[in-house]
């Protein structure tokens, strides 16, 4: 008679069809499973804790645990500092003229600063503020601020608004003055993102200029118009003859 516990391919097939009972686990397999469960149970609880939880529970650890906890705490602290450094800003903040030097010119070293000088009565300025607010959340490592133009520069002409200055280490790295330079009255979020990425102020994930299709259409339209005009001119010359 065939041993139902014999480890053969045929027995495995019979078990799959329910003809033979499930194979009994050997002593070695049981011991291996027990050891695995014991190993999983030995995972230190502090490896799943936050910094605050580590602080609360530190009295419960023995000396050996405390050495591991301290190493783990330092690792978590470094991760936290790196995250805080990366997510330093994250919003479009309003500043006044007397804050300009501290917030913009003397901003933290190697931090990109984008400031929008605006007037709330100009629709294009409101559109730019709306886009910058979204970009500030998307790129928290870059500092985004806005200021009413009169608080910074007296008698600034409306035709120069909106005005966007891009600073780094106290220097103006780029500027966009007026509606045309800022992208036009139909400016889209992705177009402004591309402009700021081109000067290095943000690291975009856009792969190409969002206005490329529009530019291609304009060039094609101009080319077609030129061909049409040349054709009309040629036909006119033939008619004259």
From Swiss-Prot:
Coarse class of the primary localization is endoplasmic reticulum
Q: Which residues lie within the region annotated Thioredoxin fold?
A: 89-241
**Keyword match DNA-binding:** no
Q: Describe the location of the Phosducin domain by residue ranges.
A: 34-202
Name recorded for this polypeptide: Phosducin-like protein 2
Report the GO terms under cellular component.
cytoplasm; endoplasmic reticulum
Keywords noted in UniProt: Differentiation, Endoplasmic reticulum, Spermatogenesis
* Signal peptide stretch: none
* GO biological process, alphabetically ordered: acrosome assembly; protein folding; sperm axoneme assembly; spermatid development
């Amino acid at each position: 008679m065939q041993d139902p516990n014999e480890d053969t391919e045929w027995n495995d097939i019979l078990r799959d069809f329910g003809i033979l009972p499930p194979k009994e686990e050997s002593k070695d397999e049981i011991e291996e499973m027990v050891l695995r469960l014991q190993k999983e149970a030995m995972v230190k609880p502090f490896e799943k804790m936050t910094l605050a939880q580590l602080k609360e529970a530190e009295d419960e650890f023995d000396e050996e645990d405390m050495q591991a906890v301290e190493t783990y705490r330092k690792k978590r602290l470094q991760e936290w500092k790196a995250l805080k450094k990366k997510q330093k800003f994250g919003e479009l903040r309003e500043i006044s003229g007397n804050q300009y030097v501290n917030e913009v010119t003397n901003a933290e070293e190697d931090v990109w600063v984008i400031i929008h000088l605006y007037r709330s009565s100009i629709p294009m300025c409101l559109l730019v503020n709306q886009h910058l607010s979204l970009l500030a959340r998307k790129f928290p490592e870059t500092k985004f601020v806005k200021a009413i133009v009169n608080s910074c520069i007296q008698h600034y002409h409306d035709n120069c608004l909106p005005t966007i200055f891009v600073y780094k280490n106290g220097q103006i790295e780029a500027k966009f003055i007026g509606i045309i330079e800022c992208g036009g009255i139909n400016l889209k979020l992705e177009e402004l993102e591309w402009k700021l990425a081109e000067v290095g102020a943000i690291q975009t994930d856009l792969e190409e200029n969002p206005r490329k299709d529009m530019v291609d259409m304009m060039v094609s339209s101009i080319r077609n118009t030129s061909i049409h005009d040349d054709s009309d001119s040629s036909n006119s010359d033939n008619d004259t003859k």
